C-alpha cells in the first residue's frame, strides 16, 4: 500500500485542546461531541482528561485526541505539557458571562505562547440556549474573531447545537493545512505525512488562506 499509515485505525492523529475559564462548558462540549452526552450536574474538571473520536474527512480517517482541563488559575502549572503537540484549540466562553469573554484574549495569548502561533483556533460562544441571559452579542464575538484570525461558532452543549460543526470545522481546517503541505512537499499522497503517535505536526503555513474569519452561529 502506498503511503504511510500510523496504524490500521486512522490516517491522522490530531491533538486539540479545550481552553477557557472554568464553568463555560468545556467538559460538556467534549462529552457531547465524543459521547453525545450532557451532564447538568457536571463539576469542574480536576486535573486533565482527554477523549478521542474519529471522523472521516476527504475519505481519510481523522482521529481527534481532545484534551480538557480545568480553567482555574491553580491548574495553570500544567500548561506546557497540556499544550505540547496541539495543532488546534477550541477557546470557549460563556455567552451569559461577559467576564469569560473578556478573558479570551488572555487565553489566546497563553495558547500562542505555548504553541505554533498559526495554530487553528475555533472561538466558541457556549450556552446559546440561554437566549434571555445573553451578555455577549454575536456581533461582538465575530469582531474579535475577525481581528484575531479565528473561526467562530455559537454552541449549546445542552441542545447539541453546532457542537459537531465546531469540532468538525476545526479538524477540517487542520487537515487541509497538513494535506496541502504534503502535496507541496511532493509526497505521493497525503497519508505519507501522517505522524507516528506522539509526533508533533507543524502546521505553520504563512502562505495559506485558512487564517481568515470563518463564521457560523446558531
Curated annotation (Swiss-Prot):
Primary location: membrane
Membrane topology per record: Lipid-anchor
CC annotations in GO: plasma membrane
Gene3D superfamilies: P-loop containing nucleotide triphosphate hydrolases
Motif residue range(s): Effector region: 42-50
Cellular location(s): Cell membrane
GO molecular-function terms, A-Z: GTP binding; GTPase activity
Signal peptide range: none
Binding-site positions, GTP: 20-27, 68-72, 126-129
A matching Pfam family: Ras
SMART domains: RAB, RAN, RAS, RHO
NCBIfam families noted in UniProt: small_GTP (TIGR00231)
Similarity-based family: Belongs to the small GTPase superfamily. Rab family.
Job of this protein: Protein transport. Probably involved in vesicular traffic.
Protein's recorded name: Ras-related protein YPT3
Organism from which the protein derives: Nicotiana plumbaginifolia (Leadwort-leaved tobacco)
Amino acid at each position: 500500500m502506498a503511503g504511510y499509515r500510523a496504524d490500521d485505525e486512522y490516517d491522522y492523529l490530531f491533538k486539540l485542546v479545550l481552553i477557557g475559564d472554568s464553568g463555560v462548558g468545556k467538559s460538556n462540549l467534549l462529552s457531547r461531541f465524543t459521547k453525545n452526552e450532557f451532564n447538568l450536574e457536571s463539576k469542574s474538571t480536576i486535573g486533565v482528561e482527554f477523549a478521542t473520536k474519529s471522523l472521516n474527512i476527504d475519505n481519510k480517517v481523522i482521529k481527534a485526541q481532545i484534551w480538557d482541563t480545568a480553567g482555574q488559575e491553580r491548574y495553570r502549572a500544567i500548561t506546557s505539557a497540556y499544550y505540547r503537540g496541539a495543532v488546534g484549540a477550541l477557546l470557549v466562553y460563556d455567552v451569559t458571562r461577559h467576564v469569560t469573554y473578556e478573558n479570551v484574549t488572555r487565553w489566546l495569548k497563553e495558547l500562542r505562547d505555548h504553541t505554533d502561533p498559526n495554530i487553528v483556533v475555533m472561538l466558541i460562544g457556549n450556552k446559546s440556549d440561554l437566549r434571555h441571559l445573553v451578555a455577549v452579542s454575536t456581533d461582538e464575538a465575530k469582531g474579535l474573531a475577525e481581528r484575531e484570525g479565528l473561526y467562530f461558532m455559537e454552541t449549546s452543549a445542552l441542545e447539541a447545537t453546532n457542537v459537531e460543526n465546531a469540532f468538525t470545522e476545526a479538524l477540517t481546517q487542520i487537515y487541509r493545512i497538513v494535506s496541502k503541505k504534503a502535496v507541496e512537499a511532493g509526497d505521493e499522497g497525503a497519508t505519507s505525512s501522517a505522524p507516528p503517535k506522539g509526533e508533533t505536526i507543524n502546521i505553520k503555513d504563512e502562505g495559506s488562506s485558512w487564517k481568515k474569519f470563518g463564521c457560523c452561529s446558531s
